[in-house]
């Protein structure tokens, strides 16, 4: 993940003495020294272990400055976006060698001309508490071309180390923002012509019966309690994911993926 960090946002890169000795070609290729003489710092293995939050650190970590964005920035974005996130700095203590394949996501506009601009596809998350869930959602969001993720202020910290690792580098490229008033944020989306759907047990229609080719937002609630009544009332429509057996609900990340990729399918 460190190798994927936008170089213009790198504040500091720390490597252990062992990592430096074993990865000279990698460090030469990354050329961190060109960013400034103080960017790269080599520390002893013992110091690096104390700096890390994992028992077997890989020997490289970074401090990356993230740009702040507004909800306005999430409408009609280019598919090949740079990461712009709603908080400042983050310690990134993860693998430098992760890589992911990317598809050509170019779309055609209504005139038939080639365009990279897509209709807004947003995720609105309320009070998610599991770092792994949030990280999985961010990673999925990049693959699906989600234009932004809006989170309530009581959602787990996106910069939780477990969350960062779960994103597998997607955190650099998916715009995310925390808001103090999630209902107000939904109102802003609706004012921009975004239709808001809530995944809800009281949904009367199956999720695949709606039109998501238009500007769309999906609301996903807390793992145990779902969406609050206050936020549910802001939805234009409630949809449900049909299930069999005694299962009443799905994992938040799974539900989010099902809904989002239905929108992707419709937009192909």
Which residues fall in each region the model found?
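N-terminal positively charged helical leader segments and presequences
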Residues: 1-55, 87-90, 94-103, 107
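RNA substrate-binding interface of SAM-dependent RNA methyltransferases
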Residues: 2-15, 32-35, 76-87, 116-203
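Structured adenosyl-cofactor binding patch, chiefly the S-adenosyl-L-methionine
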Residues: 140-144, 158, 163-171, 229-268
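Short beta->alpha connector loops at strand-helix junctions that form conserved
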Residues: 43-44, 126, 152-153, 175, ...
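Short, acidic/turn-prone active-site loops that include or flank metal/cofactor-
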Residues: 18-20, 46-47, 154-156, 223-225, ...
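Active-site/ligand-binding-proximal alpha/beta "capping" segment
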Residues: 198-246, 251
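Acidic/glycine-rich phosphate/pyrophosphate-binding loops and surrounding catalytic core
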Residues: 53-55, 59-60, 64-80, 116-117, ...
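Short, hinge-like loop/turn segments at secondary-structure boundaries
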Residues: 30-32, 58-60, 165-169, 213-217
């Amino acid at each position: 993940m460190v190798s994927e960090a936008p170089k213009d946002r790198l504040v500091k890169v720390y490597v252990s003495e062992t990592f430096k000795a074993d990865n000279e070609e990698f460090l030469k290729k990354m050329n961190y020294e060109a960013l400034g003489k103080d960017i790269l710092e080599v520390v002893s293995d013992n110091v690096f272990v104390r700096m890390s939050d994992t028992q077997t650190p890989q020997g490289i970590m970074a401090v990356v400055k993230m740009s702040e964005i507004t909800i306005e920035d999430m409408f009609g974005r280019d598919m090949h976006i740079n990461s712009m996130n709603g908080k400042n700095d983050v310690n990134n203590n993860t693998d430098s060698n992760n890589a992911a394949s990317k598809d050509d996501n170019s779309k055609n506009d209504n005139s038939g001309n080639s365009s990279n601009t897509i209709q807004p596809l947003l995720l609105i998350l309320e009070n998610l508490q599991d770092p792994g869930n949030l990280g999985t959602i961010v990673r999925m969001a990049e693959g699906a071309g989600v234009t932004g993720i809006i989170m309530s202020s009581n959602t787990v910290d996106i910069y939780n180390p477990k969350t960062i690792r779960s994103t597998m580098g997607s955190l650099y490229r998916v715009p995310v923002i925390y808001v103090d008033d999630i209902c107000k944020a939904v109102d802003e989306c609706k004012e921009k012509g975004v239709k808001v759907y809530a995944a809800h047990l009281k949904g009367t229609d199956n999720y695949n019966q709606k039109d998501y080719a238009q500007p769309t937002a999906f609301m996903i609630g807390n793992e145990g309690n779902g969406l609050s009544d206050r936020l549910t009332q802001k939805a234009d429509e409630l949809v449900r994911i049909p299930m069999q057996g005694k299962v009443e609900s799905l994992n938040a990340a799974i539900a989010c993926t099902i809904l989002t990729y239905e929108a992707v399918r419709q937009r192909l």
